[in-house]
From Swiss-Prot:
Keyword line: Chloroplast, Plastid, Ribonucleoprotein, Ribosomal protein, RNA-binding, rRNA-binding
Record-linked Pfam families: Ribosomal_L22
Compartment(s): Plastid, Chloroplast
UniProt GO MF annotations: rRNA binding; structural constituent of ribosome
Gene Ontology BP terms: translation
Entry keyword annotation includes Plastid: yes
One cellular component (GO) term of this entry: chloroplast
Protein's UniProt name: Large ribosomal subunit protein uL22c
The family this protein is said to belong to: Belongs to the universal ribosomal protein uL22 family.
């Protein structure tokens, strides 16, 4: 299902990322509401494995905004960021004496929405 966003919202979606949604949410909660440049700095300095796919997704969304809509990257901020659980990939690990144990690899879907920060000018009354 394709959702159309109104105004100057740019939406980027990464699906089937190989990590649990809980670990990705730990990083997403830190960048929600931040500006584009501040988000990139935060993601480069955080020591979590979830930072790299989120960094790529934010960078891709900003590139789409500048190429498709002609927006400046300096005016963008993260207006919405969410992580949803994906499918669980199931594998079997062989054990001794012909037995096997299941391995469950969780995946997640990450959605980033960038918006243009409104420019307010104060008028002297």
């Amino acid at each position: 299902m394709i959702k159309k966003t109104q105004g100057t919202e740019i939406r980027a979606l990464a699906r089937h990322i190989g990590m649990s949604a809980q670990k990705a949410r730990r990083v997403i909660d830190q960048i929600r509401g931040c500006s584009y440049e501040q988000t990139l700095m935060i993601l480069e300095l955080m020591p979590y494995r979830a930072c790299y796919p989120i960094f790529k997704l934010v960078y891709s969304a900003a590139a789409n905004a500048s190429h498709n809509r002609g927006l400046k990257e300096a005016d963008l901020f993260i207006s919405k960021a969410e992580v949803n659980e994906g499918v669980i990939v199931k594998r079997l690990k062989p054990q001794a004496r012909g037995r096997s144990y299941p391995i469950k690899r969780p995946t997640c879907h990450i959605t980033i929405v960038l918006s243009e920060r409104p420019n307010f000018t104060l008028k002297n009354i």
